[in-house]
């Protein structure tokens, strides 16, 4: 009670002093204890209101700073990485994504004797992905890294799908195959193996329609892409093709083929560098970026060395590709081909790789890989009958005078034209290595601007027919 009286008297004195100083012209009144308590409660409420408003403003400011902007949205990016091939380069590039927690959705690797092209699909924001691109540029032998998602491009991927097919459902499956422009590559009494190419949306649509029949296995390549050429722009590839532009032959008739090739590859002829495969290379050998004979799988030699095809089923988690390729490279094995894509079960991915070695060494490698935690299944299908396919996108320099010839060659190899401009034609073709090599060799005379190729995907043939045993022998009449 004494404390309350003291506080009241002090408060009254302060109010009286303020009124005298302000000169209101009327005597100050001494408030009673009830009025003082009301004033104190009112000030507390005003202070609480001010604090609440300040907290609200701070919360709004914080929310505005935390709220993501349009450029911070997570989106799917298609990255092209062109490198000089060396031992362990796949593991090093996969490690850059694994250390930053990125999960690679698909990967397509076009390997050559001394160079390689990676087409990688990942999810991430623009800002963080830019940091990953900068880290990739710092790696040794990385020539160029490009995000193709920012410009118009044509993209394709390849899928082999094996599903149950009894006589009662086979007609409906064939109807769906015809709608999606797919192909039957193997058939048996109870199953069918289908090959289809297209964009990822087409793959998902076909898989959804075939799920009711029972999907047994799926092998998908990663997505590959090439930049679309704009109609009406000048031809930047004319020095690559004398056949495509015959009116230029007379102007440069005194130049030898080596001189014209050197002029084009040194960049004096307006060579393009906008695609994901580059037509020039600053080396003295003057070889195209992806040669026709890249990754050629040779038959078994006298020492027992041959190429082995491995099919791995792994968990779809960040870093699993780095784990697999690291286990292979640490043991001194070279990867000739690599294709990574979603498997038939959700949460799993299938890796198809080609590794040269003897049967004994590959068996040891398989036993070592089986010890990995994220590996669900591994199968060496080299000695089994299997259907293998690869996908290639090839951009050829061809104006109106040479376009008909290029399309005739494409028809022989059952290739499809998927993009046409004033000075180029982009073709899509699927098949084995020998078919790819033969087509690329035939088109070199017209000038190959860009090439993108996937690795090999393979599925075991349920029919048991191995076409390799028929080569070199005449078929029965």
Swiss-Prot record:
Which body tissues produce this protein?
Expressed in roots in the vascular tissuem in cells around the quiescent center, in floral organs at the tips of young siliques and in the joint region between the silique and the pedicel. Barely detectable in mature leaves or siliques.
Localization, UniProt: Plastid, Chloroplast; Peroxisome
- What is the annotated role of this protein in its UniProt record? Regulatory subunit of acetohydroxy-acid synthase. Involved in the feed-back inhibition by branched-chain amino acids but not in herbicide tolerance. May play a role in valine and isoleucine-mediated feedback inhibition in roots. In vitro, inhibited by valine, but not leucine or isoleucine. Required for reproductive development and sodium homeostasis.
Task: Please summarize what the entry says happens upon disruption of the gene.
Answer: No visible phenotype under normal growth conditions. The double mutants aip1 and aip3 exhibit a lethal phenotype; they fail to develop adult organs, are chlorotic and die.
A GO MF label? acetolactate synthase regulator activity
Q: What is this protein called?
A: Acetolactate synthase small subunit 2, chloroplastic
Coiled coil segments of this chain:
none
- Cellular-component GO terms for this entry: chloroplast; peroxisome
Q: Where does L-valine bind?
A: 85, 89-90, 103-104, 316, 320-321, 334-335
Q: What is the effect of changing residue 119 to I?
A: In vat1-1; resistance to valine inhibition
Could you tell me which Pfam families the record lists for this protein? ACT_AHAS_ss (PF22629), ALS_ss_C (PF10369)
Q: Which UniProt keywords apply?
A: Amino-acid biosynthesis, Branched-chain amino acid biosynthesis, Chloroplast, Peroxisome, Plastid, Repeat, Transit peptide
| Single biological process term from Gene Ontology | valine metabolic process
Q: Where is the transit peptide?
A: 1-53
Its family remark reads:
Belongs to the acetolactate synthase small subunit family.
NCBIfam families, sorted: acolac_sm, PRK11895.1
Pathway, per Swiss-Prot/TrEMBL?
Answer: Amino-acid biosynthesis; L-isoleucine biosynthesis; L-isoleucine from 2-oxobutanoate: step 1/4; Amino-acid biosynthesis; L-valine biosynthesis; L-valine from pyruvate: step 1/4
The chain positions of domain ACT read 78-150, 309-383
Subunit relationships: The acetolactate synthase complex contains 4 homodimers of the large catalytic subunits, and 1 homotetramer of the small regulatory subunits.
């Amino acid at each position: 009670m004494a404390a309350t009286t003291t506080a009241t008297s002090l408060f009254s004195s302060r109010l009286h002093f303020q009124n005298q100083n302000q000169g209101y012209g009327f005597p100050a009144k001494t408030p009673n204890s009830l009025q003082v308590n009301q004033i104190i409660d009112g000030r507390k409420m005003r202070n609480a209101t001010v604090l609440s408003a300040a907290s609200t403003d701070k919360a709004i400011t914080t929310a505005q700073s935390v709220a993501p902007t349009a450029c911070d949205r997570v989106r799917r990016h298609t990255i092209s990485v062109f490198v000089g091939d060396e031992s362990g380069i796949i593991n090093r590039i996969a490690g850059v994504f694994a250390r930053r927690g990125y999960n690679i959705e698909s990967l397509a690797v076009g390997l050559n004797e001394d160079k390689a092209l990676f087409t990688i699909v990942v999810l991430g924001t623009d800002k963080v992905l830019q940091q990953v691109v900068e880290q990739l540029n710092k790696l040794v032998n990385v020539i160029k890294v490009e995000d193709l998602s920012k410009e118009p491009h044509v993209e394709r991927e390849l899928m082999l799908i094996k599903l149950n097919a009894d006589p009662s459902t086979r007609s409906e499956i064939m109807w769906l195959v015809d709608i999606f422009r797919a192909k039957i590559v193997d058939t048996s009494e109870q199953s069918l193996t289908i090959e289809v190419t297209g964009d990822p949306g087409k793959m998902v649509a076909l898989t959804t329609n075939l799920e009711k029949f029972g999907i047994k296995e799926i092998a998908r390549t990663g997505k590959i892409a090439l930049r679309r050429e704009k109609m009406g722009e000048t031809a930047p590839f004319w020095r690559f093709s004398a056949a495509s532009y015959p009116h230029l032959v007379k102007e440069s008739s005194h130049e030898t083929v080596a001189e014209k090739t050197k002029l084009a590859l040194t960049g004096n002829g307006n060579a393009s560098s906008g695609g994901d495969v580059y037509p020039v290379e600053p080396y003295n050998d003057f070889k195209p970026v992806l040669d026709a004979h890249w990754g050629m799988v040779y038959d078994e030699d006298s020492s027992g060395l041959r190429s082995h095809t491995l099919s791995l089923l792994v968990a779809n988690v960040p870093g699993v590709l780095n784990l697999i390729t690291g286990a292979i490279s640490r043991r001194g094995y070279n990867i000739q081909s690599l294709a990574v894509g979603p498997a038939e079960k959700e949460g799993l991915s299938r890796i198809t790789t080609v590794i040269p070695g003897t049967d004994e060494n590959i068996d040891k490698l398989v036993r070592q890989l089986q010890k990995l935690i994220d590996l669900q299944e591994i199968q060496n299908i080299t000695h089994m009958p299997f259907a293998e396919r690869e996908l290639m996108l090839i951009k050829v320099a061809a104006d109106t005078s040479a376009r008909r010839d290029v399309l005739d060659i494409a028809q022989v190899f059952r290739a499809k034209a998927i993009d046409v401009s004033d000075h180029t034609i982009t073709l899509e073709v699927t098949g084995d290595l020998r078919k790819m090599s033969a087509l690329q060799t035939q088109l070199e005379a017209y000038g190959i601007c860009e090439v993108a190729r996937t690795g090999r995907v393979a599925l075991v043939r349920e029919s048991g027919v191995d076409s390799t045993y028929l080569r070199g022998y005449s078929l029965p009449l």
